[in-house]
Curated annotation (Swiss-Prot):
Keyword Oxidoreductase applies: yes
Residues that, per the record, bind 1-deoxy-D-xylulose 5-phosphate: 126, 152-153, 186, 209, 222, 227-228, 231
Requisite cofactors: Mg(2+); Mn(2+)
Protein name per its UniProtKB record: 1-deoxy-D-xylulose 5-phosphate reductoisomerase
Organism lineage string: Bacteria, Pseudomonadati, Pseudomonadota, Gammaproteobacteria, Moraxellales
SUPFAM superfamilies the UniProt entry points to: 1-deoxy-D-xylulose-5-phosphate reductoisomerase, C-terminal domain, Glyceraldehyde-3-phosphate dehydrogenase-like, C-terminal domain, NAD(P)-binding Rossmann-fold domains
Name of the encoding gene: dxr
């Protein structure tokens, strides 16, 4: 019997990689529902191949989608709109697995809906967990949802931890003999740039990651190291560990995806070629394994693997994220909202590359922190933080 999959963000890089895996295993998985934000022609091609029962697009894209469906004689797929539609498909009774791959804060409500519906949730949307934190983790426990990390680093950590680690007490302290998590970072395309060189970085340059094929937003986050900061916060929540037990290690080759150190002196690492199909397949099938077309790692190709500490003078975003995690409450929501606005402004060439962390720092300083008591207060603070960030960008000429 096949398992039914909902893919939130099907036309993004994670969504496309997920389809690749599902297409290789039609005896195990079927696509029940998908969502897309803007690439409607691509969505139609996906629908022709995988024949989902339901698709969700923004309200303003409904007419375009229905026109293309009519041209292709597609009449057996229901079309829903907006956040309400996303929540509907993520929590649908016919769905077994939800791939949460919508970029940014827009993925929060549907991801939480999937968790509250007790689904197997493959978490590729780190921002949802950065914002909701313990609310999301508590909901997973309350509704017996299985929250499995798809980010290559968190998936590597998950594979390197004791098999029952997620069932351990959530104390903020390492459990079951674990002493530390080593979160690897490629360092991005500007690892060896000077501060002066960073001031001249263009959006086109920032979107070319040396090792991974990714979307624009995560590529820029990777270049500023904010992606690693968001991943640090995500790791703290997923694995119930305080931020001072997480060390970021720059590893330019992206072969070791992360490591876990133990009290007996052991360090376990998960290694593999940099291809998102591997962690996606792992999360889909866990605790089983799926065949993929990803070539096995050939160690003889690599004469050496390099490691270094991150330069937080050149890349202050990492420390901003660590400070936000330490502050707790709504600080990570403020951090994430300001960063999304700053990255968007950079991609539109309204601000320079080095202004991105400045926008984030200003917004964190401007807004008062408070306890993250509910999803409503998180969304309210997200909205305010975006406004403050926009105002600051305008004030510096963006």
């Amino acid at each position: 019997m096949t398992q039914s999959v909902c893919i939130l963000g099907v036309t993004g890089s994670i969504g496309r990689s997920t389809l690749k895996i599902l297409g290789q295993h039609p005896d195990k998985y079927s696509v029940f529902a998908v969502s897309a934000h803007s690439r409607i022609s691509e969505l139609v091609e996906i629908c022709k191949q995988f024949r989902p029962k339901v698709v969700v697009v923004p309200e303003q894209k409904i007419a375009e989608l229905k026109t293309l469906f009519a041209q292709q004689n597609i009449s057996d797929i229901d079309v829903l709109a907006g956040q309400e539609g996303l929540v509907d498909i993520a929590s649908h009774t016919d769905v077994d697995i939800v791939m949460a791959a919508i970029v940014g804060a827009a993925g929060l409500l549907p991801t939480l809906a999937a968790v509250k519906a007790g689904k197997r949730v493959l978490l590729a949307n780190k921002e949802a967990l950065v914002m909701s934190g313990e609310i999301m983790m508590q909901a997973a426990r309350d509704h017996q949802a299985l929250l499995l990390p798809v980010d290559s680093e968190h998936n590597a950590i998950f594979q390197s931890l004791p098999h029952n680690y997620l069932q351990a007490d959530r104390t903020g302290q390492p459990q079951l003999g674990v002493s530390k998590i080593l979160l690897t970072a490629s360092g991005g395309p500007f690892l060896n740039h000077s501060l002066e060189q960073l001031t001249h970085v263009t959006p086109q340059q920032a979107c070319k990651h040396p090792n991974w094929s990714m979307g624009q937003k995560i590529s820029v986050d990777s270049a500023t190291l904010m992606n690693k900061g968001l991943e640090l916060i995500e790791a703290c929540h997923l694995f119930s560990i305080s931020e001072h037990f997480v060390t970021v290690v720059v590893h330019p080759q992206s072969i070791i995806h992360s490591m876990v150190q133990y009290v007996d002196g052991s360090t376990l690492a998960q290694m593999g070629n940099p291809d998102m199909c591997t962690p996606i397949a792992h999360a889909l099938a866990w605790p089983e394994r799926l065949q993929t077309n990803v070539p096995a790692l050939d160690l003889f190709e690599y004469s050496q693997l390099n490691f270094q500490a991150p330069d937080t003078q050149k890349f202050p975003a990492l420390n901003l994220a660590r400070q936000a995690m330490r502050a707790g409450g709504l600080a990570p929501t403020i951090l994430n909202a300001a960063n999304e606005i700053a990255v968007e402004a950079f991609l539109m060439e309204r601000i320079g590359f080095t202004s991105i962390p400045q926008v984030v720092e200003h917004t964190l300083e401007k807004l008062e922190n408070a306890a993250a008591e509910s999803i409503e207060c998180i969304l309210d603070k997200d909205k305010v933080a975006r406004s403050v960030a926009q105002q600051y960008i305008s004030s510096i000429g963006g």
